[in-house]
A protein has these predicted regions:
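Short Pro-Cys-Gly-centered "Cys-loop" motif that presents a nucleophilic cysteine in a tight turn
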Residues: 1-137
Length: 137
């Protein structure tokens, strides 16, 4: 099931449903399944009411999709089936690969107010040593 290294990334709470859609569509995107509801590895079938998983607790943003279970299921199915824009998939993938937060500018300012250096993407490894003798041109 797992391939490569475990990856995680901080996300803006308002982006949660987009990330969940990314996960639900991943088997389709990679060619393992033809439809998200065919996958046994996602919660899509549960979220559209085809399957009951008593251990699954829905996120508060999922509950905001509608007042009734049927309304939430329909809105979720429509949201997932419309798919994500290509740029959004790229941003989420890059965020995971680089362990970079995927947050809005407003959320980033609030989150990194006391430590702005953590908001920047840094390259792997140790920073290059600066030699003051070689920097004079």
């Amino acid at each position: 099931i797992w391939e490569g290294r475990y990856r995680s990334s901080l996300i803006d709470p308002d982006y949660f449903l987009r990330c969940q859609r990314y996960i639900e569509l991943n088997p389709v995107r990679t060619g393992y399944e033809s439809s998200p509801q065919d996958s046994a590895w996602t919660s899509f079938a549960t979220h559209i009411g085809e399957n009951a998983e008593p251990w699954l607790v829905d996120h508060q943003h999922f509950w905001r999709l509608g007042n009734t279970p049927f309304e939430r299921q329909m809105k979720w199915a429509d949201f997932v089936k419309e798919g994500a824009p290509h740029w959004e998939d790229r941003q989420i993938t890059e965020s995971l690969i680089r362990s970079k937060p995927w947050v809005s500018d407003i959320y980033a300012k609030k989150l990194f107010k006391n430590a702005p250096e953590f908001a920047q993407i840094r390259h792997r490894g140790r920073p290059k040593k600066i030699n003051p003798l070689n920097s004079v041109g």
